[in-house]
Amino acid sequence: MSCFYLDLLKIKDPSFMKQLDIQELEALAADIRAFLITSTSKSGGHIGPNLGVVELTIALHYSFNSPKDKFIWDVGHQSYVHKILTGRASQFGTLREHGGLDGFPKRKESIHDVFETGHSSTSLSAAAGMVIARDIKKEEFYVIPIIGDGALTGGMALEALNHIGDMGKDMIVILNDNDMSIAPNVGAIHNILGKLRTSDTFKQTKAKVDGTFFEELGFMYLGPINGHDIEEVITNLELAKRTKGPVLLHIVTKKGKGYQPAELDSRGTWHGTGPYKVETGSFIKPAKRAASWSSVISNELIRLAEKDERIVAITPAMPVGSKLEKFAKAFPERFFDVGIAEQHATTMAAGLATQGMKPFLTIYSTFLQRAYDQLVHDVCRQKLNVVIGIDRAGLVGADGETHQGIFDISFLNSIPNMTISMPKDEVEARQLMDTAFSYNDGPFAIRYPRGEAPGAQVAESNTLIPIGKWETIIQPIDAVILTFGPTIRLALKAAEQLELEGYHVGVINARYIKPLDEALLHQILKQKIPILTVEESLLKGGFGASVLEFIEASNYSDVVMHRIGLPDEFISHGSVSIILESFGISTTGIVLKIKEMLAQSGKLRAKRL
């Protein structure tokens, strides 16, 4: 079995591995590693994490019997090898495409994916539930959560460790320690692992590690173990299987193992990538026309911080993605990467605000969900001046259900004292940043999407934008489109097309999602023209819903209004443009809906020839 690569596409399940010897397992590892590099070079994906767990995943499937034994992949981005070994190699050509193979574990995709993940630090709690259910039902199987050292900094993981150790039930926890999560890890837990990792690494005896952090919590600790030595990993897994009570195997791996550009990565660049050239390690990207939204926000933050020493920046383990590295270098004493700890980050920002500081809390929209109670209880309830940069707001595409930034408007809309905004271009982003740090009446959220910000070549502008004041881009006559952020361009194109047919459709930049521009809304409603709201977010509890509530509360009748947005469902992975088109969030969708509304109001005319 020295040439195993060609057989990868024929794998149906992991049972064949039981017949392989160590050399054959190592050959399998080499073939899988080559397959991963080739396939992700075309599709993109989480190549670094998966190259680091090739041998570990092979050892797990060799020692256990999936799906009877339950693997729970924390975060789940490192599950590609697991997918290959469970019969999905042939689908890797569709990885993260619309309708294709998911980049994370998916229960409907395979019986071997027993729990879906995407956010970090959830695996241990899920595993606790499974072992409790197993024992109540008097069943026999192993539960094996695989969690990284980065995810172990999350409070939820520590809560679960505390409970699992106290319960004393049989469970085998795999700690995949690669000294990185997305960015280099931080914190005391990271330091503890570092001491274990460097103390006679791979030669520790049980006697030498008595009293470790994990044993104090009630776990039997095995390690550190070389995660790229299949035989050593299997030996320790077999020992863990014979041990009663919770066991933690400390597996040391190298992120990006086997592909030099990924191995040498210290910034997290190779954590998740787009397509790349295998030979050179260079990324294949379309020509960049403008700065990213994250860069625009970060650069403005630096400019403001140069003038105001009260401004500090906080990120929960995303300094690279949120483009805060320059800020960290310029103001190291005012930059805080707290690790995967969104709840702590949010209340820490609240504490800073009580002392007159001006915290900028930057969190991806999908991860802001994790800090909801802290937003309500600690920030908004106390009306504290915290500026929240909601990065990756809207659809993010390939990462799918677990990462779409589509819920924040709905869950922030209901919180008193919260201001929510979203710029249409770079200049407006800078203006909203300036406005936010000049605002002294509570929390101020600025949403911005993934990708490039239009308007990069426009001159600097420091004009503050009055709270709740919208911008009329095209004066409405026959109908009006209310929208914000990236969908502004769709509305403008739709208005241009409709103008050619003789319809004068207004476009309003509703850059403040909360509060609404009530004065402008009254003015529009008095015109008695059709109103269309467009948003790249959930309709339930969204911007359009707020407009409807305003209309009802203001006792307007006979209003022709429609909302375009995302339905009440989790949105799967795929191209953002394809997803938007499928829900009518497109120029064509807007044009058709406006015509439908004009017909409903009796204002549709025959198309000009």
From Swiss-Prot:
Keyword set for this entry?
Isoprene biosynthesis, Magnesium, Metal-binding, Thiamine biosynthesis, Thiamine pyrophosphate, Transferase
Q: Name one GO molecular function term.
A: 1-deoxy-D-xylulose-5-phosphate synthase activity
Question: Which residues does UniProt call coiled coil?
Answer: none
Instruction: Write out the GO cellular component annotations.
Output: cytosol
GO biological process: one example? isopentenyl diphosphate biosynthetic process, methylerythritol 4-phosphate pathway
InterPro entries associated with the record: Dxylulose-5-P_synthase, THDP-binding, Transketo_C/PFOR_II, Transketolase-like_Pyr-bd, Transketolase_BS, Transketolase_C, Transketolase_CS
Q: In which pathway does it act?
A: Metabolic intermediate biosynthesis; 1-deoxy-D-xylulose 5-phosphate biosynthesis; 1-deoxy-D-xylulose 5-phosphate from D-glyceraldehyde 3-phosphate and pyruvate: step 1/1
So which cofactors does this thing need? Mg(2+); thiamine diphosphate
Binding-site list for thiamine diphosphate: 77, 118-120, 150-151, 178, 259, 342
The note on cofactor binding and number reads:
Binds 1 Mg(2+) ion per subunit. Binds 1 thiamine pyrophosphate per subunit.
Instruction: Tell me yes or no: is Metal-binding among this UniProt entry's keywords.
Output: yes
Please give the catalytic activity noted in the UniProt record: D-glyceraldehyde 3-phosphate + pyruvate + H(+) = 1-deoxy-D-xylulose 5-phosphate + CO2
Into which family does the record put it?
Belongs to the transketolase family. DXPS subfamily.
The record's function comment reads: Catalyzes the acyloin condensation reaction between C atoms 2 and 3 of pyruvate and glyceraldehyde 3-phosphate to yield 1-deoxy-D-xylulose-5-phosphate (DXP).
User: What's the subunit arrangement here?
Assistant: Homodimer.
Q: What is this protein called?
A: 1-deoxy-D-xylulose-5-phosphate synthase
